[in-house]
Amino acid sequence: MRQIAFYGKGGIGKSTTQQNTMAAMAEMGRRVMIVGCDPKADSTRLILHSKAQTSVIKLAAEKGSVEDLELNEVLVEGQWGIKCVESGGPEPGVGCAGRGVITSITYLEEAGAYENLDFVTYDVLGDVVCGGFAMPIRQGKAQEIYIVTSGEMMAMYAANNIARGVLKYGHSGGVRLGGLICNSRNTDREDELIIELARRLNTQMIHFIPRNNVVQHAEVRRMTVIEYDPQNSQANEYRQLAKKIDNNEMKTIPTPIRMDELEELLIEFGIMEQEDESIIAKANATS
């Protein structure tokens, strides 16, 4: 069984990419479980055709404790037999959502949810790699990390920060960076830029996903593109990504870059002009 995690900046399309890729993986015959580690609890909606799956934390609060839960209450089987779980989190402004991730994964392990699987995938909130959200990395639950990014500055900034988190635990545990997934925003020279960022981070751009409105059309119907329009070229993009992950042999300890190196990269590719340096300088001063 391989345990992988998808990290990335909020709004980058991480959950959509993960669900479409795992749908393609299941279509290939792989036995898959998705564990949502985002308080929004939207990591499984396209597989289950639902607004949001009831989370482990919410059910535990209703029942009294996690120990009072039955596995079939929190683990739901969706399209292609994909097993789905949402860890959930507290109400906004109350408590640490990262603790929900820790509680949920511990419960799933003890309840035997990880048996007879080929892939377990964690969909993790990734603007910041705080202790709770880093739990799949920190405790070696996820062995392979895939960072969803784009040619936009803040998406690359987040990718570099996540790479720092992987590096921190890469030597002490078995976690490795499997690659960058470029979820295109149609920015200038985007594929070249992410290939170069990947090179500097000692990894690969494992796949470039072009922008296609069919993704939004499928999402509105709470479906993956694989299910909504299986013959569409975009469905084949996700199938290609699934095959690349399935066969991926390049798993590395990353080499995060400094903020001034990221700045130089953006200038080199014409994304940022010299006069914009103050933006990066301010970010650098607070990082």
Curated annotation (Swiss-Prot):
ATP binds at G8, K9, G10, G11, I12, G13, K14, S15. Binds 1 [4Fe-4S] cluster per dimer. [4Fe-4S] cluster binds at C96, C130. The reversible ADP-ribosylation of Arg-99 inactivates the nitrogenase reductase and regulates nitrogenase activity. It is an enzyme of class 1 (oxidoreductase). One of its GO terms (molecular function) is 4 iron, 4 sulfur cluster binding. The keyword ATP-binding applies. The modification ADP-ribosylarginine is found at R99. Keywords: 4Fe-4S, ADP-ribosylation, ATP-binding, Iron, Iron-sulfur, Metal-binding, Nitrogen fixation, Nucleotide-binding, Oxidoreductase. The keyword GTP-binding does not apply. Its cofactor is [4Fe-4S] cluster. Its EC number is 1.18.6.1. The key enzymatic reactions in nitrogen fixation are catalyzed by the nitrogenase complex, which has 2 components: the iron protein and the molybdenum-iron protein. Homodimer. Belongs to the NifH/BchL/ChlL family. This is Nitrogenase iron protein. It comes from Frankia sp. (strain EuIK1). The gene is nifH.
